[in-house]
């Protein structure tokens, strides 16, 4: 029995000398010390030995077991240290090599355009107001002279959260909230994201940016509206830009109009973008409807006002000659690095 134990010890030593991996170490441990291992089987058979042999063989068996366990432990530690050394060597940074430049981001054209638009209106005395993107039906529709079952609601595919909550389809609700909370004179713009249930294509997106403006005071006329927007267009697109106003209809303004600007592609000569007309629709505007003023407890016999609104994305496309709105939302650095 003692000879068998010595053979097991020597066999384990020889195998451990050629071990190169943790998996091989585990296989050796199982072979000799596992539940069905060679040394374990001997220890289980000690009951068949005589009382004189049992303590002698038990002592030798425990010594062999301890030796194998300690040798495996040392081998495991050596392998672990070698792996660590290899890893550290591979991870070593050669400080004499030139470093890799970090990619530098640029401001998004939407952000640049929004800032330009804000600066222009701030220079004209406008303040910036904000409001929630999840809006009450009252502010998004009813207070803007768009009651339930009004035909204008069918023109805006709306994301409804429930019967009384929507994702705002315009930033006009901010105008209503401002008129409720402030007394005239009011001169404000409301930039922000809006949501429409539109299919994505070159000119439509379910999420886009809009900026609306409102002026309410005594004696405000359509001439004030026209002068403000013409000045904005020249500061935004240059002194050579031409504008014109066309009659239109909006439920919340009366009279209403749309303002066109000379095409940014052909400079008014006529092309595919402007469909040969030389003009591109820029924004909608009009005098605030008397009922909208009444809805905000402002007397239309004393005060009047004008409002306007435009898509910021459209402004970006006009300013930079971009023909596909999807480029603004794809985060393609090849495109964004041009600005």
UniProtKB/Swiss-Prot annotation:
Keywords from the UniProt entry: Aminoacyl-tRNA synthetase, ATP-binding, Cytoplasm, Ligase, Magnesium, Metal-binding, Nucleotide-binding, Protein biosynthesis
Keyword Lyase in annotation: no
Class of this enzyme: ligase
EC identifiers of the protein: 6.1.1.20
InterPro entries, sorted: aa-tRNA-synth_II (IPR006195), aa-tRNA-synth_II/BPL/LPL (IPR045864), Phe-tRNA-synth_IIc_asu (IPR004529), Phe-tRNA_ligase_II_N (IPR004188), Phe_tRNA_ligase_alpha1_bac (IPR022911), Phenylalanyl-tRNA_Synthase (IPR002319), tRNA-bd_arm (IPR010978)
UniProt xrefs under SUPFAM superfamilies: Class II aaRS and biotin synthetases (SSF55681), tRNA-binding arm (SSF46589)
One Gene Ontology CC term in the entry: cytoplasm
Subcellular locations according to the entry: Cytoplasm
One function term, GO molecular function aspect: magnesium ion binding
Listed GO biological process terms: phenylalanyl-tRNA aminoacylation
Lineage top rank: taxon: Bacteria
Record-listed Mg(2+) binding positions: 254
Recorded family membership: Belongs to the class-II aminoacyl-tRNA synthetase family. Phe-tRNA synthetase alpha subunit type 1 subfamily.
Oligomer status and interactors: Tetramer of two alpha and two beta subunits.
Entry protein name: Phenylalanine--tRNA ligase alpha subunit
Organism: Clostridium botulinum (strain Hall / ATCC 3502 / NCTC 13319 / Type A)
């Amino acid at each position: 029995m003692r000879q068998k134990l010595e053979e097991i010890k020597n066999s384990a030593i020889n195998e451990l000398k050629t071990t190169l991996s943790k998996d091989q170490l585990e296989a050796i441990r199982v072979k000799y010390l596992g539940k069905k291992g060679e040394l374990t089987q001997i220890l289980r058979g000690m009951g068949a030995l005589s009382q004189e042999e049992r303590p002698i063989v038990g002592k030798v068996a425990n010594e062999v077991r301890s030796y194998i366990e300690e040798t495996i432990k040392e081998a495991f530690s050596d392998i672990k240290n070698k792996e660590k050394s290899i890893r550290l060597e591979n991870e070593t940074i050669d400080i004499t090599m030139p470093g890799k430049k970090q990619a530098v981001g640029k401001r998004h054209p939407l952000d640049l355009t929004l800032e330009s638009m804000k600066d222009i209106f701030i220079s004209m005395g406008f303040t910036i107001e904000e409001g929630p993107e999840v809006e009450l039906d009252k502010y998004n529709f009813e207070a803007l002279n768009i009651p339930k079952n009004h035909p204008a609601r069918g023109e805006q595919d709306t994301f409804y959260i429930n019967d009384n909550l929507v994702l705002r389809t315009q930033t006009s609700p901010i105008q209503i909230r401002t008129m409720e909370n402030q007394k005239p004179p009011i001169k404000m713009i409301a930039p922000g994201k809006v949501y429409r249930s539109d299919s994505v294509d070159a000119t439509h997106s379910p999420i886009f940016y809009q900026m609306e403006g409102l002026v309410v005071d005594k004696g405000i006329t359509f001439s004030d509206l026209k002068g403000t927007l013409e000045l904005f267009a020249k500061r935004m697109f240059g002194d050579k830009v031409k504008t014109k106003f066309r009659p239109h209809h909006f439920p919340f303004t009366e009279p209403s109009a749309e303002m066109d600007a000379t095409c940014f592609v052909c400079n008014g000569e006529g092309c595919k973008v402007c469909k040969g007309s030389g003009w591109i629709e820029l924004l909608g505007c009009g005098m605030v409807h008397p009922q909208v003023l009444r809805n905000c407890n402002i007397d239309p016999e004393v005060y009047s006002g004008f409002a306007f609104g435009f898509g910021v994305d459209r402004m970006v496309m006009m300013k930079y000659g971009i023909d596909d709105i999807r480029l603004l939302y794809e985060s393609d650095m090849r495109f964004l690095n041009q600005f």
